[in-house]
């Protein structure tokens, strides 16, 4: 195995792991990184599927006890049944739209310019959502009775994943549909969508993680099946490297994000998205980087 190829696998694996669950779009970053590293051919696309699978397994491992409890209680525990129904309801809209428009989206929207514009628009939406929450009184450690009442009045109505009903799940699922546009971010769409629909930042983040499991796992199986003719034993080494680094970086990222959202908002990610999108557009139109359409 070439050292240069192995290094590309390491870089892309880390990029996938760090961006899959942050509201900054893993697909957008992989499209851009793949072009910069000249690793965006058909094998490169299969590689992306493999490292996405590594990232989603990291979430499964982090929430393994919760997943085991839900699976074991599907026939006896109403809470587990409701949770499973919510995940299914939230997953269906994106699957339906992907099956109908998936080919068109990949043919027309998977390019750096679309990604850059989605980065910027998504960043603005995050800022507006955070500003809305601040105006509603979702403040940290309010001081004084007046501020305390304001915080209570504007506080999220859902403070636990177990309190979600199917209508809440459907709203988050509809928000997830926006993530079909590369650069939008699946986690960003579900987290910000959840917050706008009354979920606390922590609940929206946790539910977003659980939604990623059926969505990414299903997409992985489907895409690998379609590309089965291109799979080769010779690629196991490079795929394995990317898989491992995606798993490890995603695992660390998920743990960090769960702690981060307990005391911070998403404004830093919004400004990052806007700045990164502007840089991509500037390099494209200046000719500094020859992004491919």
UniProtKB/Swiss-Prot annotation:
User: Could you say which EC number(s) this protein's record lists?
Assistant: 3.6.1.27
**What gene does the UniProt entry assign to this protein?**
uppP
Q: What else is known?
A: Bacitracin is thought to be involved in the inhibition of peptidoglycan synthesis by sequestering undecaprenyl diphosphate, thereby reducing the pool of lipid carrier available.
Similarity comment text for this entry = Belongs to the UppP family.
Q: Does the keyword Cytoplasm apply?
A: no
Which NCBIfam families does its entry note? PRK00281.1-2 (NF001389), PRK00281.1-4 (NF001390)
Keywords of this entry: Antibiotic resistance, Cell inner membrane, Cell membrane, Cell shape, Cell wall biogenesis/degradation, Hydrolase, Membrane, Peptidoglycan synthesis, Transmembrane, Transmembrane helix
GO BP terms: namely: cell wall organization; peptidoglycan biosynthetic process; regulation of cell shape; response to antibiotic
Task: List, alphabetically, the InterPro entries matched.
Answer: UppP (IPR003824)
Q: Does the keyword Membrane apply?
A: yes
**HAMAP family cross-referenced by the UniProt entry:** Undec_diphosphatase (MF_01006)
Segments crossing the lipid bilayer: 3-23, 43-63, 85-105, 109-129, 178-198, 203-223, 238-258, 269-289
What topology in the membrane does the UniProt record assign? Multi-pass membrane protein
Q: Where in the cell is it found?
A: Cell inner membrane
| Protein role | Catalyzes the dephosphorylation of undecaprenyl diphosphate (UPP). Confers resistance to bacitracin.
**Reaction equations catalysed:** di-trans,octa-cis-undecaprenyl diphosphate + H2O = di-trans,octa-cis-undecaprenyl phosphate + phosphate + H(+)
Per the record, its GO cellular-component terms are: plasma membrane
One of the entry's Gene Ontology molecular-function terms is:
undecaprenyl-diphosphatase activity
Protein name as annotated: Undecaprenyl-diphosphatase
A Pfam family of the record is: BacA
